[in-house]
Amino acid sequence: MTENAQPMFSIEKIYIKDLSLEVPNAPKIFLERDTPQISVQLRTEGNTVDEGLYEVTLTVTVSATLGEDRSVFLVEVAQAGVFQIRNVPPAELEPVMMIGCPNILFPYAREAVSAAVSRAGFQPIVLAPVNFEALYQQQQAAKEGGDVAIQ
């Protein structure tokens, strides 16, 4: 392999693409003493920006509810990055974008969620680390109709 054909990966820019926070039952919700049920959803999307430049967006949605229908808060962060990815075989490009890039973006999204929730008057939410490789394998297995155990 020549020097020009070496795989190349670099971070060009990391930014918040979208951030929303809803506290629909304020101020009465602050009087509640029950511990809310927390739900976390993740979604990763990748798009081509230019030749060798890709935008990856990791969307983290965290909702807190009391009982089945009383919303405490809903926060959604779309943490994005522009990555330069060159000389990577086509079969390896998707795993880089769906595993490697989200691993880089997740700490930024986690901090944005925690900051938004605490600024809304609640205890900060600390999201647990995510195994993006296992999520990717699960999604691939679902596409192919197979089963993969998540560890």
UniProtKB/Swiss-Prot annotation:
GO BP of this protein: protein folding; protein tetramerization; protein transport
Molecular function in Gene Ontology: unfolded protein binding
Pfam families per record: SecB
Keyword S-adenosyl-L-methionine included in the entry's annotation: no
Gene3D superfamilies: SecB-like
Keywords of this entry: Chaperone, Cytoplasm, Protein transport, Translocation, Transport
Annotated compartments: Cytoplasm
Ranges annotated as spanning the membrane: none
One cellular-component annotation, GO: cytoplasm
Classification via InterPro entries: SecB, SecB-like_sf
Keyword Hydrolase among UniProt keywords: no
Self-association and partners: Homotetramer, a dimer of dimers. One homotetramer interacts with 1 SecA dimer.
Family affiliation: Belongs to the SecB family.
HAMAP family assigned to the protein according to its UniProt record, in alphabetical order: SecB
Function of the molecule: One of the proteins required for the normal export of preproteins out of the cell cytoplasm. It is a molecular chaperone that binds to a subset of precursor proteins, maintaining them in a translocation-competent state. It also specifically binds to its receptor SecA.
UniProt name for this protein: Protein-export protein SecB
Protein source organism: Azoarcus sp. (strain BH72)
Gene assigned in the entry: secB
